[in-house]
Swiss-Prot record:
Gene: ndk
Record's function text: Major role in the synthesis of nucleoside triphosphates other than ATP. The ATP gamma phosphate is transferred to the NDP beta phosphate via a ping-pong mechanism, using a phosphorylated active-site intermediate.
The enzyme's E.C. designation: 2.7.4.6
Homology family: Belongs to the NDK family.
Subunit structure: Homotetramer.
Residues annotated as catalytic: 117
Main location: cytoplasm
Annotated GO biological process: CTP biosynthetic process; GTP biosynthetic process; UTP biosynthetic process
Protein name: Nucleoside diphosphate kinase
Length: 143
């Protein structure tokens, strides 16, 4: 098993409903360690840059508007197969299709406001982590 790092966002809808602690508990209960975190209110430019790969898609404007509608939590998680483990904890992108007990099933209202984001691969995780965190901000958990 490989120790990996993945990137996670708790989106504005879940932050507004005070689900941060409950979601962090899910990460830690699943064996993922939080090695960096911070609260941000994305600017339009930051959101457009982060989601640039979707810029030609019809939902891009709504996504940027949603992601700038309130504070978010960004965090780096570390653990065995962290990318897959995190995505399993999140559940399906559409909360209506997410398995009971997953973050999206429990905390999300719709596919547009689905509580959280998780990297889909180790490579995208590295890119997404670097977008929000410097190397100095990552704190290895040695104990």
């Amino acid at each position: 098993m490989a120790i990996e790092r993945t990137f996670s966002i708790i989106k504005p809808d879940a932050v507004a409903k005070n689900h941060i602690g409950a979601i962090y508990n899910r990460f830690e209960t699943a064996g993922l360690k939080i090695v960096a975190s911070k609260m941000l209110h994305l600017t339009k430019e930051q959101a457009e840059g982060f989601y640039a790969e979707h810029s030609e898609r019809g939902f891009f404007g709504a996504l940027v508007a949603f992601m700038t509608s309130g504070p978010i939590m960004v965090q780096v998680l570390e653990g065995e197969n962290a990318v897959l483990a995190h995505r399993e904890i999140l559940g399906a992108t559409n909360p209506a299709q997410a398995a009971p007990g997953t973050i999206r099933a429990d905390f999300a209202e719709s596919i547009d406001e689905n509580a959280a984001h998780g990297s889909d691969a180790v490579e995208s995780a590295a890119r997404e982590i670097a977008y929000f965190f410097s190397a100095e901000e990552l704190c290895p958990r040695t104990r």
